[in-house]
Amino acid sequence: MIVVKVLLFSEGKNTFSRSGVGQALNHQVEALGANNVEFTLNPDEDYDIVHINTLGIKSWRVLKKAKKKKKPVIYHTHTTYEDFKGSVKGSNQLAPIIRFWAKKSYNGADYLISPTEYTKNLITEKYLNKEKEIRVISNGVNIEKIKKDEELKKNFLKKHKINKPLIITAGLPFERKGIKDFVKIVERCSDYQFLWFGSSSIKSMLPKKIQKIIENPPKNLIFPGYVEKEELIGAFGAAKLFLFMTYEENEGIVVLEALSAKLPLVVRDIPVYENWLQDGINCFKARNNDEFYKKMVSIVNEKVENINEIIENGYKIAKERDLKKIGAKYKEYYEYILENKNI
């Protein structure tokens, strides 16, 4: 057995701790810990292999330094041009710069990890100058931490004074995440209560039209901002379903959390969810607002005959991606790389 010490590197850890990339780093720490893999977050410490999560000058320097020391470099392909568009102010103008850095960084690495087959194919077709080994490993989820809890559910309902059927979603409130479509659904359903969980600290970074939605939402929509995991678990227990209207993802950790909580999941029918998420088998898929509305109403009104079977199948998807299993996959990949080291 090869003894491995891994440098997990993400720049701007504090700034982006509540983003998907920030959550992914937390999951890596947990996954490696569960598999007794030694790691460090400090690039000044010694290590055998570096696993980089972010794009940027500091990340590039870490890559170059590792190369100089003949240490293998893995880049995690969390960030793409496609999923950066429609996020913060000026993101569409900045997206080509993100693409430049993504190409430079991913081509500079020795090995890559993508969270889904969709992202692997996207990186292969649009980002790489030559063939490179890419391992598909989910960002994972801790299924033990996302179990429904009756007490947390009661506390949540009391805190937010909810007495209508509850629909929830989560994620940074970006246009790419489908926030404008979400609001249209909210306006159509005055007899339902909606909550969008996600960091409100970035509000000033959002386009004016999105800021206005957050500042003046419909009466039946609440933006609680970022909440601790206990409150989110309370929401999972209280909600009728999880509505995820995003237009572009590389996986979506919140999707895995909803499945772990055995909450009916309605997602947009986009390429990243092909094959592993199946409409009417382990989730519900919609292509437009009308379809989202119809599927949502049928779930709330308990019109789906095999709903329990669909929920259990969804839970199996999350179980396959439990962090302990994900950590074992990281460990196997690290050992494989060190055994075949040819840097």
Where do the PLM segments sit?
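Nucleotide-activated donor-binding/catalytic signature segment of Leloir-type glycosyltransferases, i.e.
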Residues: P207-E230
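Short hydrophobic beta-strand element within catalytic cores of glycosyltransferases
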Residues: P264-V267
